Amino acid sequence: WVLTFVTIDFIYYWYHRCSHRVRFLWAVHMNHHSSEEMNFSVALRQAWFGPITKIPFFMLMPLIGFDPIITAAAGIISTLWGVLGHTQWIKRLGLLEYILVTPSAHRVHHGSNEEYIDKNYGNLLIVWDRIFGTFANEKNKVVYGIIDNVQTFNPVKITFQFWITMYRDYKNAKSLKDKILCFVGRPEWKPDQ
């Protein structure tokens, strides 16, 4: 069980990091970060296509020998822990801040403050962020949302906003390389850059 939790969390860290750094994965994940509030409802604001994009990452578990039932159970428990991180009610948790992704660490992850962008990708263990240099402590007041906040509460518009941006970039791209980067480049990337 312990090895299953650690492995799931390690894979989740990389899946989540890619979801912030690869355009088409950001298009899937962006609506979760578009809320300018932080509460438990944000945990429910999940990507419509998220389960599909997780398959290539998490199919590794049974392929390398982990029991699928134990993997699924550990995944559910890990997800429930992630839900608890979406709150402002719980402040800092002392020594647990060094081991677990606490609500404080996850608030940082949802911040659009410059010092908080692309930080704290872990779900259960904060150690991956510490090891891979993506950790940040909650120091300043967190400004929630994305850099260019959406100006709507319409879930369909929020879900497809970045897909439309990618399509427009694709239409304007001059080279094959730029057309490919429209989907696999960094979210802030634009053609001819």
Name the predicted role of every residue range.
Residues 1-144:
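Membrane-embedded catalytic scaffold of the fatty acid hydroxylase/desaturase
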